[in-house]
Design a protein with these regions (language model features):
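The feature marks the mature, well-folded catalytic cores of soluble enzymes
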Residues: 1-309
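Intrinsic disorder at enzyme termini
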Residues: 7-12, 19-35, 45, 409-502, ...
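Generic, well-ordered alpha-helical scaffold segments in large soluble proteins
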Residues: 73, 77, 81, 97-101, ...
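Short coil/turn segments at secondary-structure boundaries
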Residues: 140, 183, 267-271, 398-402, ...
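Amphipathic alpha-helical surface "interface" segments used
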Residues: 190, 273-280, 407-411, 445-451
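Ferredoxin-type iron-sulfur electron-transfer modules in oxidoreductases and energy-metabolism complexes
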Residues: 282-310, 325-439, 482
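Short Cys/His-rich zinc-binding micro-motifs
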Residues: 313
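Extended amphipathic alpha-helical segments enriched in small hydrophobics
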Residues: 316-320, 366
Length: 522
């Protein structure tokens, strides 16, 4: 199983587990409401927000259209700054490359900052298997690592923990004796991590954006741990996706304005670093050795497909913060380190449809994700494309395929359609419960129970639409004829009245004229 997929249970089972966890729901709902509220408030302050989104999408598309050029420019400038750059076609190549660096150094441990790329390639487990401990220094990642859990969000990975469960976790695993106050827990965590930072010979970080014109790597964090991991150890290993490049610092400025606002609803993060190469002779801190591992892992395949817009992604998490499905099934319902709408698109591209054929159906296609995406990825369109691919490639359960084939045959045949619509109401009526609806009493029926286990279904009306429409048409035509007759009658009446009035006027005028005898007398 790929390191991207951490739970190989069927999608239905994962969703059932998630739906049964009340705390997760409340945590996700609260986080979505808070982060989305902050984001919306900040977005409203930016008059040209949509222009920023358009510009950011153009920047990402420009880089992707010229990726070979910008990768070369970035690598060349990074090497000029003293860094060693490695190109890893696959996750295995990346892992072997990183292991070689550790073995050359004789290092047996490292401190890590939060990095989706290292999670994608499964770095922690790989290093552990080779006797090297990787210590997560991001607070949320450290909680997850201590608990042995999977992340539930790409920005807030420990979203499924509350302060009490964190306190209990550290009491059990780390000897913590304090309260559940977040500040007190953080101070305790600092006592654990500070010695690790000071003694570490290797720091492993990700990279939010590589700047091609300078060969710099940027790090965004709220805790400052990424800066510690990239400045104290003698050696820094940067692991990044080969597409995470911007042309220049001006482009970086655009991305940063969008990233932090979209991710956590803030104007800027607590810590933002631009690391450019190794420590120079006149500098007090920073790594003496910098190794940059640029990972492909299927990205160039995506580049040449209809899913190319997905490579615009800047990993802000805005799509899952607005997603109604994520709100209910939580991050663990997806079973991937990439949850939510972006994960539904990206995971099958990296892993394949064999393991993820059902994942694209965990979406309502409401379009909320596309509305908030800072780089305007058409996520609903890409999810729909996955569904088309899954059907065309045959990754559909035999029962489902047979059901849709039967439905197609029925709807395309007038006789079969007539029989089905005649018989179906009686069958559905027989299945109704006390509510006169098809309800939980039918959970013994396969397939149907997937609906009725949680909601009721109204039976079909015995009167067919065609019958109703024909009757309605007759009534409508009769009403129209009656109305027309009334209008004609009313018009005739008006004409008659007008004619009678004119006649009376004529008669009155005629009686007022002088007679012939009167004229003779005159």
């Amino acid at each position: 199983m790929s390191s991207i997929i951490y739970d190989d249970a069927p999608l239905e089972e994962r969703i059932h587990r998630s739906l049964s966890d009340t705390f997760k729901h409340r945590a996700i709902e609260t986080a979505q409401d808070v982060i989305t509220g902050k984001r919306n408030a900040l977005v409203a302050e930016v008059e040209n927000w949509e222009e920023f989104r358009d510009h950011a999408a153009e920047i990402r598309d420009h880089v992707l259209a010229n990726l070979d050029y910008y990768v070369k420019e970035f690598a060349t400038n990074a090497q000029k700054n003293g860094a060693q750059v490695y190109f890893a076609p696959t996750d295995t190549d990346a892992l072997d490359c990183i292991l070689d660096i550790f073995e050359d150094l004789g290092a047996t441990s490292c401190v890590k900052s939060k990095s989706m790329m290292t999670e994608e390639i499964g770095l922690n487990k790989f290093l552990e298997k080779h006797g090297i401990s990787a210590i997560e220094t991001d607070c949320a990642e450290h909680i997850i690592q201590t608990a042995g859990n999977a992340p539930s969000h790409i920005v807030v990975p420990a979203l499924h923990f509350d302060r009490t469960s964190i306190r209990d976790l550290y009491r059990e695993r780390k000897g913590y004796t304090g309260s559940d106050d977040p500040e007190e827990i953080t101070r305790f965590l600092r006592t654990i991590l500070r010695p690790e930072f000071m003694n570490a010979s290797v720091g492993v970080t990700g990279c939010n954006f590589g700047v091609a014109e300078t060969g710099s790597c940027t790090l965004v964090s709220n805790e400052g741990n990424a800066r510690m991991a990239s400045s104290i150890p003698e050696t820094q290993i940067i692991v990044m996706g080969c597409e995470r490049i911007v042309p220049d610092l001006r482009s970086l400025d655009v991305m940063m304005k969008l990233l932090v606002r979209s991710a956590v609803g803030a104007k800027i993060s607590g810590s933002f670093s631009i690391n450019t190469g190794c420590r120079r002779e006149n500098e007090a801190d920073g790594p003496k050795n910098v190794h940059i591992v640029m990972v492909n892992n299927g990205r160039t395949n995506i580049l040449g497909s209809n899913f190319k817009p997905m490579l615009r992604c800047i990993r802000c998490g805005a799509c899952m913060n607005s997603c109604p499905v994520y709100r209910h099934i939580t991050g663990h319902g997806y079973g991937s380190i990439y949850p939510g709408p972006m994960g539904i698109v990206l995971t099958p591209l990296l892993v394949g449809y064999k393991e993820t054929a059902k994942l694209p159906y965990a979406c309502s296609l409401c379009g909320s994700c596309a509305d908030v995406c800072p780089v305007k990825i058409p996520l609903p369109d890409l999810i729909a494309q996955h569904r088309r691919n899954i059907v065309s490639l045959g990754y559909v359960p035999p029962a489902e395929k047979a059901a849709f084939s039967a439905a197609a045959a029925t709807f395309s045949n007038r006789t079969l359609y007539g029989i089905a619509t005649t018989v179906a109401p009686s069958i559905m009526k027989a299945l109704t419960g006390n509510t006169n609806q098809i309800d939980k009493s039918t959970t013994f029926i396969p397939v149907l129970n997937g609906w009725t286990a949680s909601r009721n279904l109204d039976p079909m009306n015995k009167e067919k639409f065609r019958t109703w429409f024909a009757h309605h048409k007759q009534e409508r035509n009769a009403a129209q004829r009656t109305k027309a007759a009334r209008e004609i009658s009313a018009a005739a009446s008006r004409v008659h009245n007008a004619a009678e009035k004119n006649l009376n006027t004529y008669k009155a005028d005629e009686t007022s004229l002088p007679t012939s005898s009167t004229r003779k007398e005159d």
